[in-house]
Amino acid sequence: LLFIVILIIYIFTANTDVTYTDNGELAAACAMLGIAHPTGYPLFTLLGHLWSLIPFGFSKIYSLNLFAAILTALSSIVLFYTSLMILSNAKFRNKQIIEGSQKRKRHIDISYQNLDLSSFSQIIISLIIALTYGLAQTIWEQANSLEVYSLQLLLMNLVIFFVLKAYFSHSKKYYFITAFCLGLTMSNHLTGILLVPAILWLY
């Protein structure tokens, strides 16, 4: 439902023609399987080319702009599930000062307790987070016309989701999925490298 709502909004605001910045160049690269300006964005070009082969019945530039809208809407869904996972595993620190006897000084007892939120509350909070993200100006702009950042938003959200999944579940398979998604992110846009320090700090 969240995906449908956000996607409908994106479709109504999507550009029907070539717009500013690299939109025309990237659309041409996707349609003709060409090479865009460095770094070339190979993953984006390949996926965009496959999408452009689908006979929608309207112009390729409009269909590619809708492709960006779908990718951005999908990133909102990933963020929704990431928020759900964080809220269901969140803990808060409880600090208590314990007074000691004459021979023993007082000390601080620190414990961690689960954030006691109902499933309904977790869903509502996650919905608000995802909608705020999806309708923020910077994110919304990526959904209106074809740009590499729409795919990058999806991939970076997937990296964050799986790295947290690996952290909470301690399952090796999610480490490998995280590495795979990070590689895909790098093959699309080099801003993916900004996630590496956060991943290293987490582990």
How would you label these PLM feature ranges?
Residues 14-26, 36-47:
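Extracytoplasmic catalytic/substrate-binding loops of multi-pass membrane glycan-assembly enzymes
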Residues 66-114, 155-165:
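Transmembrane-helix motifs of polytopic, lipid-linked glycan transferases
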Residues 9, 14, 48, 52, ...:
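Membrane-water interface at transmembrane helix exits
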Residues 120, 143, 156-175, 182, ...:
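Membrane-interface transmembrane helices that cradle and orient dolichyl/undecaprenyl
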Residues 29-32, 129-131, 175-188:
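Membrane-interface alpha helices of multi-pass inner-membrane proteins
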Residues 195-203:
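Perimembrane helix-loop-helix junctions
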Residues 13, 54-61, 65, 98-119, ...:
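Aromatic- and kink-enriched transmembrane "portal" helix at the membrane-lumen/periplasm boundary
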Residues 1-20, 133-135, 189:
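Transmembrane signal-anchor helices characteristic of membrane glycosylation enzymes that use polyprenol
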